[in-house]
A protein has these predicted regions:
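A short acidic, glycine-rich active-site loop
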Residues: 76-86
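Crotonase-fold acyl-CoA enzyme core
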Residues: 96-205
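Glycine-rich phosphate-binding loop at the start of an alpha helix
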Residues: 68, 82, 89, 112, ...
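Hydrophobic alpha-helical segments that mediate membrane insertion or helix-helix packing
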Residues: 23, 41, 58, 117-118, ...
Length: 235
């Protein structure tokens, strides 16, 4: 086990099993996406690429994958809050274009930024249970950015797009499969084994072609996401 980073409320563990890297995040709370979380996930992705692993699994803690951005960071001032948001959006682009196969092991609730991270992954498996997966932006009075809309449009089924992105409908894991948030839901005690099974299968595909074809089939979405990042950088 390699601990990527640890501050007061942040811990990301990097492990490699069967040449599959597992990035497991657990802050003991909501797995909020804040500056240290972003540092640690980026470091883990860098390490996975440097070690040339076959695939990467992103895993939350039991009961929650991630509850979204760290609201405490916004209380420190607009500039710090917007810097965190910009870095979070950079992470979404990196994940969605990541050259290695990327598997989400959704261990529980996946809300807001947590749900967007799940959507960036190539294969997404969730634990069954009384968990919420949703985009609450409308419900909490926030506007979606073009970057988020592009990602959501690419992943969420057309039949559910209005309910997901506009009406902030809350889905349980089984419902989230139909909506397009995730690909399959399994019993909690089977989640890690199933995520590893999928990761190993993807790792056996030709890596160069996997990376190239990922960029090709996601080119339009990534262009829209990067265009929005460029606009944000001008502000």
């Amino acid at each position: 086990m390699y601990v990527i980073g640890k501050l007061e409320e942040r811990l990301v563990e990097y492990t490699v099993i069967n040449n599959i890297a597992i990035l497991a995040f657990d802050d003991g709370k909501a797995n909020a996406v804040g500056p240290q979380f972003l540092d640690d996930i980026d470091a883990g992705l860098d390490r996975a690429q440097a070690e040339q692993v076959g695939a990467v699994i992103l895993r939350g803690r039991e009961g929650i994958f991630s509850g979204g951005f760290d609201l405490e960071e916004f209380k420190k001032g607009v500039e710090l809050g917007m810097t965190m948001v910009g870095r979070g959006f950079d992470l979404l682009v990196r994940l969605y274009s990541f050259p290695l196969p990327l598997v989400a092991a959704c261990t529980g609730h996946g809300v807001a930024m947590g749900a967007f991270i799940i959507m960036t992954c190539d294969s997404r498996i969730a634990s069954r249970g009384n968990f919420k997966i949703s985009l609450p932006e409308t419900a909490i009075g926030m506007e979606l950015t073009p970057l988020l809309v592009a990602l959501t449009t690419a992943r969420i089924s057309r039949q559910h797009m209005t309910r997901v992105a506009l009406q902030s409908e809350v889905y349980n894991p089984e419902q989230a499969v139909e909506a397009g948030f995730i690909d399959e839901a399994v019993e909690a005690d089977l989640l890690d084994a199933r995520a590893m099974e999928v990761a190993l299968k993807l790792a056996n595909l030709p890596q160069a072609q996997y990376a190239a074809n990922k960029l090709l089939i996601r080119a339009n979405t990534l262009q829209a996401m990067n265009d929005n990042l460029a606009e944000m950088a001008k502000r």
